[in-house]
Amino acid sequence: NSLLPLPVKQVLNNHNLKGMHNILGNLIEIENVYSLAISTALGASSSNIVVDNSECAKTAIKYLNDEKIGRVTFLPLDTLKPKEIDIDTKNTLNNEIGFIGIASNLIKYNSLYSNIVSNILGNVIVVDNIDNANRISKIINHRYKIVTLNGEVLHVGGSITGGFNKTSNIITIKYELENYIK
């Protein structure tokens, strides 16, 4: 975890802080074929720390402030609510060429984290390529984020992000290491 931001490392390594689980990226398993799409969908959330409750987050934030270490985003198990795609849109998507699935359904995780995973990925659509992503985005009126297997993003409202990305996050590094070991 040497690639984690320093404040995240400091919090995770401080054994006086109770209720810290891990960073989200370490609490999920992703098939290699989906790793770029999911890591793109997660973005900085992959380094957010899952905690038991908002009190644990407050205690950790006090520590970060007192020590002037930096900022961290916490995902409290007791407050995050699931997000999902409405049933009509799901039915539409199921008939569309290129639709792969909802991001939260393409990964494995302990059911304890289902609200958190659903909050971050439950309304993100994964599609095979940018052409199908563009077409599907228009059909659903740009109401949901769409990511492609190559990591392009069609944002809510219609803006598009893409191109080569040489930065890595915890997910892509985890899979590069696994492939290297194989």
What are these regions (language model features)?
Residues 2-182:
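Hinge-like oligomerization/junction regions that interrupt long coiled-coil arms in large cytoskeletal
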